[in-house]
């Protein structure tokens, strides 16, 4: 942690599914909550409750029966700024319990985030929250830093979007970044669908949360999909039981690996796009021939949707099949990859060399929101 008397920076990673926030220098985020804002469906039905016009995060989640829930971040990009402001307000005042005007704030953005979005983010931080300094970093770059590298290709797959981001000497290569609109939320939807085919009914948003839990606890990636299906059909070795909140116990078999298989075969959910292995390969092929070897040897997985057991081995197998035969392939799956964007930000914001990189309020007052393009790249 920072020295006494020194003001610690705040690190906030805004994902499509979860917000991860905390203090730079810490080894894990203090606050992790859903990126949702809920508004009452009916005015004044809740007797004796101080009616709030909006609920954020876990509180919105727990009162979801009487609220309309919205995700202000879609596919990694902020689409609803009023709700986003509510999320940041909740992060600073309720979760971290700090005054934002007293701390520099490091925020994250999706790769290829539109310029206007970074400016809006900058403007809200300085004008609404009066922060003394701020910086915007690309999520995948922070994940790479967290793995102790400055060159490599990051496959970052969260709840709302997946990106492959080649990075050389600390700089993302924008022409080679690829985006795949297939991520955790789609895997949950697919698992709901295949469990329904098995005769279990999951339809509501509340039930979706149960299925998400089943996915997180039981899903895994098969090294050989066809062989695994054959095994599943002939034996019950992969079957696991799961207890629903009402006490009913359900059995889940081949769904365990059919669910994350979608990442390698998006066709299963009707998407005509390449799987994560092919997208990673395509991304590498868009880079200069001289740096490809460094990328093949440093494929770093990041984000919650890369947490399924077996994913690194399968990824390694698939990319080895695509790459030149003499190429050395290394897929790295750090155990803390669910939070590696946050951890990378925590590391970056506490480096002494980074202190000159912050955008100060004085610079913002002089240049306006466009300062972000000159100082954050």
From Swiss-Prot:
GO terms for molecular function: ATP binding; hydrolase activity. Gene3D superfamilies: 3.30.420.40, Actin, Chain A, domain 4. It comes from the Eukaryota. It holds the Pfam family Actin. InterPro entries: Actin (IPR004000), Actin/actin-like_CS (IPR020902), Actin_CS (IPR004001), ATPase_NBD (IPR043129). It is found in: Cytoplasm, Cytoskeleton. It catalyses: ATP + H2O = ADP + phosphate + H(+). Keywords: ATP-binding, Cytoplasm, Cytoskeleton, Hydrolase, Nucleotide-binding. Signal peptide: none annotated. SMART domains: ACTIN. Its EC number is 3.6.4.-. One of its GO terms (cellular component) is cytoskeleton. Actins are highly conserved proteins that are involved in various types of cell motility and are ubiquitously expressed in all eukaryotic cells. Belongs to the actin family. This is Actin. It comes from Mesostigma viride. The lineage of its organism: Eukaryota, Viridiplantae, Streptophyta, Mesostigmatophyceae, Mesostigmatales.
